[in-house]
Amino acid sequence: MESEAIQEDLQNLDVELKDVQGQISALIEHQDRLYERKSELKTLLKALAASGSPVASSGGSSAIENWSETFEWDSRADDVRFNVFGISKYRANQKEIINAIMTGRDVLVIMAAGGGKSLCYQLPAMLRGGTTLVVSPLLSLIQDQVMGLAALGISAYMLTSTSGKENEKFVYKALEKGEDDLKILYVTPEKVSKSKRFMSKLEKCHNAGRLSLISIDEAHCCSQWGHDFRPDYKNLSILKTQFPKVPMVALTATATQKVQNDLIEMLHIPKCVKFVSSVNRPNLFYSVREKSAVGKLVVDEIAEFIRESYSNNESGIVYCFSRKECEQIAGDLRERGISADYYHADMDANMREKVHMRWSKNKLQVIVGTVAFGMGINKPDVRFVIHHSLSKSMETYYQESGRAGRDGLPSECILFFRSADVPRQSSMVFYEYSGLQNLYDIVRYCQSKTKCRRSAFFRHFGEPSQDCNGMCDNCALSSEVKEVDVSDLSKLVVSMVQETQAKDQRVTMLQLGDKLRNKHKDLIAELKRDEVEHLVIKLIVDSVLKEEFQHTPYSTNAYVTMGPLANQLLQGRKTIKMETSSRQTKKLKRSITFSGLELKLDELRKEISAADGSILPHTVLSTQQIGSISSQKPVSLQELESIIGKLKTEKYGDRILEEVMRHEAVSEQLVEDPTKEETCKSRLRKRAKTQKDVVLVESSGEEEA
């Protein structure tokens, strides 16, 4: 008997020690997160102390440098910005970034999607002379950029796995001998890390003094702490090693302080100037919707939303978890009258390109894609991004949802959340460093019924909070939210897991829900399966339970086990509370209303794009430019040039003015008499030409003076 008592004591001690070890692990993990947060806050304090002025990054000079002052290239930069790129004014930090690059400094740019990162290296490429090398991860992005630059008359080429022999021959000759004009060269990171021939030609270009700038786009791919780490990006440090005096600019939309430090080290740019813009996207409306367990109902809701809010064929993206889901949901949307097609990595490259171009040219309203679609897409007028499934982290969701509204106009970001999606994602990310913690962060974002969605991004990226202005569901929709103590029910859940483990068995979240409902019918009969799963996920996120994973020949399964804080709950030292809300899904009309002239100009840019075949509609006229033309209604090429710049006026000015004049004629009800309309249009065209001639004469006179 005495030995049995001792044995029992030993078992109790083992249980208690295991509990203590679990608590220690949880505390250490919490300590690491606190240290990381402390580091972010210190960096934030330094930035605030600098009154918004960018400062040299750690390792560089601590002196504040004024990149907003006047520089010798200012007038040339303004001329190229407006007359070549058609951009009327700089956005936040663009001018300062360009000035830092022009002085020969290495630069790190953290700028939200739609902030204008591309101009930050494309404009210096035009000003510095020689060749600018741009490393970009995706072929579709490279093709978009090269096409857009070619439409502006800029000599841009790409060297990728799909490049033809003639193109490759031209590029290598231009790099080696400099006989042909090669202003911007786009390559994938694989070309840098794996092609000795390319690096040899690039070295000859450098030795001849013609390599003027190196740009690393989507730079977060360098960091193992980033949400989209790519091994080939690790080898890009060779560029700074081989060409130490060539300025390098690294750009990304998302990077925590940890990621920033990592990529600075990996790219060998310790003395870079760092520009960090706000992560806030005030034009985006964020919302989370409960996802039905019935797939048909989810697609019905998505289709209804698109039909009611975006009936003018405005572009959108629907993200899905798997390739199979992409194909299924694209087909389901088509059956419901939505113009949709799918995009994923298993497709033939030509098919992917075809779908991408149809969507880019507004011939297809919705792309249904996996994460393979979208990084750095060059389409500013995406009006909505819908996540049919959960993203794997806050950073990933910020990046993917941020593909909406890059033109600054109101757009929507909707995430459909269901607890059953969590194990699907966790079994994919558990092997990544902090993969589970990152996933649980976005689960908290989805489960919250009171906290501002936007503030979650501020906290995650270590940025001071800003007003949401009602641009998320939790801030815009009033509802009665209650906190309910579910500790007793949680104890039943944990006890069930404990019993299962004692029998040396495993249980998935779905199995756990069924077992609970069968064993405790009287207590939880009123709870639906979704509500039980919601509680289990809450316990996992709160470290009361945890997920463990087992590989099979065909998949990786997620099982629920006891977490580090389980015994605290069972002993009554921890309470579990959940938010309940009476809020019903309310339809918010957030679509944009375009005037008649704006719609006509939109049709015109699509027509020009289709006729040319090699340019995208927004390259012809941006949505902002259409808005400016519609409000100012120019009647001469001179007035139009002041809105869209010289290059676009020369290319498309006559057709744009004709559309404006036709619209004005209709507005004045001149269409009733065709002769009057023709007379009016003829008179206005003549007046436009005369005013253009006068401007040119005045310009010549000023130059002579």
Curated annotation (Swiss-Prot):
Cofactor(s) this protein requires: Mg(2+); Mn(2+)
InterPro entries: DEAD/DEAH_box_helicase_dom, DNA_helicase_ATP-dep_RecQ, Helicase_ATP-bd, Helicase_C-like, HRDC-like_sf, HRDC_dom, HRDC_dom_sf, P-loop_NTPase
Primary localisation category: nucleus
Motif (DEAH box): 217-220
Tissue specificity: Expressed in shoots and flowers. Expressed in young leaves, inflorescences, roots, shoot apical meristem, young siliques, and mature green siliques.
Binding residues annotated for ATP, in chain numbering: M111, A112, A113, G114, G115, G116, K117, S118
Uppermost EC category: isomerase
Chain ranges of the Helicase ATP-binding domain: 98-273
Function recorded in the entry: 3'-5' DNA helicase that may play a role in the repair of DNA. Its DNA unwinding activity in vitro is dependent on magnesium, and ATP or dATP. Can use GTP/dGTP, CTP/dCTP or UTP/dUTP as nucleotide cofactors. Catalyzes Holliday junction branch migration and replication fork regression. Disrupts D-loop structures. Unwinds G-quadruplex DNA, found in telomeric DNA.
Subunit architecture: Interacts with WEX.
Protein name stated in the entry: ATP-dependent DNA helicase Q-like 2
Originating species: Arabidopsis thaliana
